[in-house]
Amino acid sequence: REIADYYIDTSLMSTSTLKENVLNIFLDTPSDSMTISCISFGFKYGVPNEADLVFDVRCLPNPYYIPELKEKSGLDKEVRDYVMSFESSQTLQTKLFDLIDFLIPQYLHEGKSQLVIAFGCTGGKHRSATFAENMCEHLSKNHLKARVLHRDVNKDKK
C-alpha cells in the first residue's frame, strides 16, 4: 500500500462501483459519460452483433424505388429530405429520440459506458443511413459523445 499510486478497498464494493472507481482513476472522461455509436445496416447483410438496440425502419417509404435517388445514399441531402418528408418518418424519429433520451440516463445509472444503436433497412443505404445520421446529430446537439458508422452503405456499388 505504501508504494501504490492508487488503493481501492473492494471488500464492501459492488462490481459496478469498482468499475466506476477504476474508470474515474484511469480515464479522462467522467463516470457519467457514455460513447454512443449509431450504426446503419442492411438486414440482407445481417444484424450487427455489437448492437444493443436495433430499430427496423423498413416500414418507411423506400428511396430505392425513386430513380434519381436509387444510386444515392442517406448521406446525401436529397435522400435524407425524401425520407424525412413523410409524416410517418417524422413521427418515428420523434418517438426514437424520446426513447433514447429516456434510456441513456438509465444505462448510465447501471454503469454502461458504451451504447450501440443500430438502424436497419433492406440494403443499409437510404433509410437506415438517414436515421443513423439524424440520431447522431440529435445526440451531439445534446452534448453526448456520439459517432456514426454506415456499415453497408457502399456494399452494392460496383
Which residues are covered by each model-predicted region?
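C-terminal accessory "lid"/substrate-recognition subdomains
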Residues: R1-I117, S140, N154-K158
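Post-Walker A helix-loop "phosphate-sensing" segment adjacent to the P-loop in P-loop NTPases
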Residues: C136-A146
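Long, positively charged, glycine-interspersed low-complexity recognition regions
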Residues: K112, A132, V148-H150
